[in-house]
């Protein structure tokens, strides 16, 4: 049995879960998320908990078991608490500003870079070098944060770029002159 897959998911108060065959819908105070579970995996509600089971121990079913349980758990956490990723910008002249719901970056290019907020994602800017990406869908929040980070990846020589808060960059020593 999968250690991740066999653990039941507690349904907090204020969260409504509907399971219709392979389709799972989770409603909570922050919004609604839905997911289609892969075919051999079955989800059910028992005693205020969601349990995810697999029919047999085939290799594919074992891998889908833990995945499906984690995705459903991420939905429950998302509609109750939400997800936030904080980021920092390092570099002279590098800054970010909130323009309506979108982010405008000044990253040393000849033009400002604009990132539009997809549905369900909100941006917050603290000062002009710190920002946070928030939403209820863990995958969307992480994807947008990765797209923002990719705009100007950290330079190992100068330490300039966009990074996640608390991320340590391995610095390199430059060439030594003769």
Curated annotation (Swiss-Prot):
* A GO BP entry: cytoplasmic translation
Q: Which UniProt keywords apply?
A: Ribonucleoprotein, Ribosomal protein, RNA-binding, rRNA-binding
Single GO MF descriptor: rRNA binding
Q: Which residues form a coiled coil?
A: none
What's a single GO CC term here?
cytosolic large ribosomal subunit
Q: Which Gene3D superfamilies has this protein been placed in?
A: Ribosomal protein L6, alpha-beta domain
Is-annotated flag, keyword Nucleotide-binding?
no
Fill in the subunit field for this protein: Part of the 50S ribosomal subunit.
What family is it from?
Belongs to the universal ribosomal protein uL6 family.
Q: What does this protein do?
A: This protein binds to the 23S rRNA, and is important in its secondary structure. It is located near the subunit interface in the base of the L7/L12 stalk, and near the tRNA binding site of the peptidyltransferase center.
Q: What is this protein called?
A: Large ribosomal subunit protein uL6
Origin organism of this chain?
Corynebacterium diphtheriae (strain ATCC 700971 / NCTC 13129 / Biotype gravis)
């Amino acid at each position: 049995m999968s250690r991740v897959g066999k653990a039941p998911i507690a349904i907090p108060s204020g969260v409504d879960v509907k399971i219709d065959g392979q389709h799972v819908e989770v409603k909570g105070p922050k919004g609604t998320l839905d997911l289609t579970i892969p075919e051999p995996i079955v989800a059910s509600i028992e005693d205020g908990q969601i349990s995810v089971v697999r029919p047999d121990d085939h290799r594919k079913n074992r891998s889908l078991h833990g995945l499906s349980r984690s995705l459903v758990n991420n939905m429950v956490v998302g509609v109750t608490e939400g997800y936030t990723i904080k980021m920092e910008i390092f570099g002279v002249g590098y800054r970010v500003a909130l323009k309506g719901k979108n982010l405008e970056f000044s990253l040393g290019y000849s033009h400002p870079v604009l990132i539009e907020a997809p549905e369900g994602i909100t941006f917050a800017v603290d000062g002009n070098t710190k920002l946070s990406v928030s939403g209820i869908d863990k995958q969307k929040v992480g994807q947008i944060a990765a797209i923002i980070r990719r705009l100007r990846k950290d330079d190992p020589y100068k330490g300039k770029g966009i990074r996640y808060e608390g991320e340590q960059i391995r610095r390199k020593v430059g060439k030594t002159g003769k």
